[in-house]
Structures are given as C-alpha cells and as structure tokens.
UniProtKB/Swiss-Prot annotation:
Native source species: Ovis aries (Sheep)
Signal peptide: 1-20
Matching InterPro entries: B2Microglobulin (IPR015707), Ig-like_dom (IPR007110), Ig-like_dom_sf (IPR036179), Ig-like_fold (IPR013783), Ig/MHC_CS (IPR003006), Ig_C1-set (IPR003597), MHC/Immunoglobulin (IPR050160)
Keywords, ordered alphabetically: Disulfide bond, Immunity, Immunoglobulin domain, MHC I, Secreted, Signal
Cysteine disulfide partners in this protein: 45-99
Quaternary structure and partners: Heterodimer of an alpha chain and a beta chain. Beta-2-microglobulin is the beta-chain of major histocompatibility complex class I molecules.
Protein name per UniProt: Beta-2-microglobulin
Gene Ontology process terms (BP): antigen processing and presentation of peptide antigen via MHC class I; immune response
Pfam families: C1-set
Length: 118
C-alpha cells in the first residue's frame, strides 16, 4: 500500500513539474494563397513551441482585432504546444495585418506583422 501511494505521489509531482517549464511562443504570419489586392484570401497565424498552454492570439487589421477562428490546442513530442488562428481577409496595399500573442512568458504582447512579400 505504501509503495502504491509513493508511486502516485511521485507521478503527481512529476506532472506538476511540467508547469514549471516555460517556453516563449514562436509566431509565423502568412496568407494561404499568394496575395492579390482585392482577391479574398485567408490570413494565418501559426504559434508554436510554447508552454504552459494558456495563450491569447488575436489577428489584427490596422491594429484592430478582427474575427478569427482557432484550431484545437495540440502538443509536440517535447510537450510544447501549438495553435493556428486564421481569418478570411481581402488584402490591399493600404491595410496592415498582424498577429498579437499574449503569453505568461512575455512581458508584453508579441506583435508580428504580415509581410505580403514572403
């Protein structure tokens, strides 16, 4: 009985230690198709390599939040997490699009601009 209790306690302690590992999110912003002004497309924000899993991701048009959808939270072999946030958009040369990520590892939100030339 004591051995079982010790094993359970050891397992719980090792799981709680996962929260102590913090990893800063990496961010990539790209369009699904090559951009053409006035042609509908999808803007993607891929956020990966972060831990713990609690994170806020917003897609922005000229600094204002736009309606977006998000994939289910997934994790890699190293227990870091990744998500894809995406939104329909129609690019033009006047508007600026970006992705804003807020995570416990960041002192301020990380904002990555979409570069239409990539």
């Amino acid at each position: 009985m004591a051995v079982s209790a010790a094993l359970v306690l050891l397992g719980l302690l090792s799981l709680s230690g996962l929260d102590a590992i913090q990893r800063i999110p990496e961010v990539q912003v790209y369009s699904r198709h090559p951009p053409e002004d006035g042609k509908p497309n999808y803007l993607n924000c891929y956020v990966y390599g972060f831990h713990p899993p609690q994170i806020e991701i917003d897609l922005l048009k000229n600094g204002e939040k736009i309606k977006s959808e998000q994939s289910d939270l997934s994790f890699s072999k190293d227990w870091s997490f990744y998500l894809l946030s995406h939104a329909e958009f129609t690019p033009n040369s006047k508007d600026q699009y970006s992705c804003r990520v807020n995570h416990v590892t960041l002192t301020q939100p990380k904002i990555v601009k979409w570069d239409r030339d990539l």
